[in-house]
């Protein structure tokens, strides 16, 4: 067996070999001291941390976090109607039953020009009373243009100027320069 002993001695494959005596157990403590730079997928799932978080941020907290809500604002946004979308409706009621149409139009945010010409005075008075009540209830505005024509507006429409003065021609047009082209 000389040749087989020579080969095993050469490869040190026999039992009396102490080849691992000089080897120290470096990997025995490896798992205890090792900190993973990237959290595992399971840890990220339950802690909510992303892959880019640092190791210091990865500490797991078992206390429940308080939900984060934006502070309640005391300002409530209001839908405003642009001047382009403003609509004026001319209504000429014939009976008291038509007064409901005035209120419905105001509730949609549209202004109403109420023409009561040609109606019996008592019915016209009842329609004005009804319209004044509904205008007051929605905090709108009711203005007399002439004896039989009224302007009824919802709260989102402001009326400026003196309407009867404008209708009767009470504005002095001489203050406008006709030679100057402003537009």
UniProtKB/Swiss-Prot annotation:
Compositional bias, Acidic residues, is annotated for: 16-36
Q: What is this protein called?
A: Cell division protein SepF
The UniProt keyword set, sorted, is: Cell cycle, Cell division, Cytoplasm, Septation
Species this chain originates from: Lachnospira eligens (strain ATCC 27750 / DSM 3376 / VPI C15-48 / C15-B4) (Eubacterium eligens)
Q: Which Gene3D superfamilies match?
A: SepF-like protein (3.30.110.150)
UniProt similarity note: Belongs to the SepF family.
Function text: Cell division protein that is part of the divisome complex and is recruited early to the Z-ring. Probably stimulates Z-ring formation, perhaps through the cross-linking of FtsZ protofilaments. Its function overlaps with FtsA.
Q: Name one GO cellular component term.
A: cytoplasm
Q: Name the segments for region: Disordered.
A: 13-58
| GO biological process entries | division septum assembly; FtsZ-dependent cytokinesis
PANTHER family listed in its UniProt record: CELL DIVISION PROTEIN SEPF
